[in-house]
């Protein structure tokens, strides 16, 4: 039996309800750092020009034409990790990506950390006014940057424009607590998800077998409510979620979905069926389970799950309790 988690519940329980009834250094490194940045830009520009067959000097300013700099990564022979390391943020150790801003002494810090700082973390000098480092931006456009989750096993290196989007969906990023509506802020590896659920969310029931009945009690509770249950079969764990939301005043909808405690690739090996039965009526939904990396919110937003309103729920409910037949199968 799955009891509801309503607003104001404890965070350690069955997915607490949604709030409101809804569900270093001193100044000595200044010159050296600025010189290193300038040297890196000059070296990359020279290498790019050589690879493109540009010869001779440019009259006037002594700069290399832009077309000679904006080359693909393969056009930079002898590229080394030392060059990429020049873009390392001294605060978070991720990479400083365009638009690249520097302090008055030439030190770099990523835009995310910059918003939290009042002075340069390297020289303690002012970060304002903002100074754009166009040379380093051109160098960055020629380099592949490792995914921020490379230490966790991701082997991809990407152009800076592709890096943020990849990291949003990277399979190696930390997993968050999959309990919907809970205020739990836990993060960890995939192997740690089930131990976390068993320790911090002990009220969640786990049923064994590929065919079970998910019984949601007290579906007439007001406001946004979540019901959660675990199902274990085929050597994997699945999370069953029934969520009630008030889409607009006076109109409530139920959303039911199955998540795999696993990766997206693992989820593709399974299919699930949700079925409401009663009074010679039947409502069925079949789909591939989502990975807990994807979560419930996106599926609900796109209605990519079993969706029904309160009038439908009452057709299948018995004394305010709703039973959903859940079947997991391997593809």
From Swiss-Prot:
GO MF: ubiquitin conjugating enzyme binding; ubiquitin protein ligase activity; zinc ion binding
Residue ranges of the region described as SBD: 139-331
GO terms under cellular component: cytoplasm
Keyword Cell cycle: yes
GO biological process, one term: regulation of circadian rhythm
Biological or metabolic pathway of the protein: Protein modification; protein ubiquitination
Known tissue expression: In embryos it is expressed in all blastomeres starting at the mid-blastulla. After 20 somite stage, it is expressed mainly in the posterior part. Expressed in brain, including the eye, the cranial cavity, otic vesicle, optic chiasm and in the gut.
Matches recorded under SUPFAM superfamilies: RING/U-box (SSF57850), TRAF domain-like (SSF49599)
Residues annotated as binding Zn(2+) 1: 147, 154, 166, 170
Free-text comment about domains: The RING-type zinc finger domain is essential for ubiquitin ligase activity. The SBD domain (substrate-binding domain) mediates the homodimerization and the interaction with substrate proteins. It is related to the TRAF family.
Name the record gives this protein: E3 ubiquitin-protein ligase Siah2
UniProt organism field: Danio rerio
């Amino acid at each position: 039996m799955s009891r509801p988690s309503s607003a104001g519940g404890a965070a350690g329980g069955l997915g607490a309800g949604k709030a409101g009834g809804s569900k270093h250094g001193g100044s000595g490194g200044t010159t050296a750092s600025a010189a290193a940045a300038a040297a890196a830009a000059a070296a990359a520009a020279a290498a790019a020009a050589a690879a493109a067959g540009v010869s001779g000097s440019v009259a006037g300013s002594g700069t290399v034409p832009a077309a000679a700099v904006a080359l693909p990564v393969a056009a930079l022979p002898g590229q080394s990790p030392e060059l990429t390391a020049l873009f390392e943020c001294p605060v978070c150790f991720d990479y400083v990506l365009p638009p690249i801003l520097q302090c008055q002494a030439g030190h770099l810090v990523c835009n995310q950390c910059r918003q939290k700082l009042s002075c340069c973390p390297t020289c303690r000098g002012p970060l304002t006014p903002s100074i754009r480092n166009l040379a380093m931006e051109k160098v960055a456009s020629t380099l592949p940057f490792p995914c921020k989750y490379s230490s966790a096993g991701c082997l991809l290196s990407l152009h800076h424009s592709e890096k943020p989007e990849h990291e949003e969906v990277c399979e190696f990023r930390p997993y968050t607590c999959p309990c919907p509506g809970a205020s739990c802020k836990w993060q960890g590896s995939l192997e740690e998800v089930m131990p976390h659920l068993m320790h911090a969310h002990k009220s969640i029931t786990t049923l064994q077998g590929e065919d079970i009945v998910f019984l949601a009690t007290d579906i007439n509770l007001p406001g946004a409510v979540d019901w959660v249950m675990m199902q274990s079969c085929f050597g994997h764990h699945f999370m069953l979620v029934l969520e009630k939301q008030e889409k607009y005043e006076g109109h409530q909808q139920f959303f039911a979905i199955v998540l795999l405690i696993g990766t997206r690739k693992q989820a593709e090996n399974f299919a699930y069926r949700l079925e409401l039965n009663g009074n010679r009526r039947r409502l069925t939904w079949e789909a591939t389970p989502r990975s807990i990396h994807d979560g419930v919110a996106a599926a609900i937003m796109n209605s990519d799950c079993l969706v029904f309103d309160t009038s439908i729920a009452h057709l299948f409910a018995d004394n305010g309790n709703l039973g959903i037949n859940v079947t997991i199968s391997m593809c």
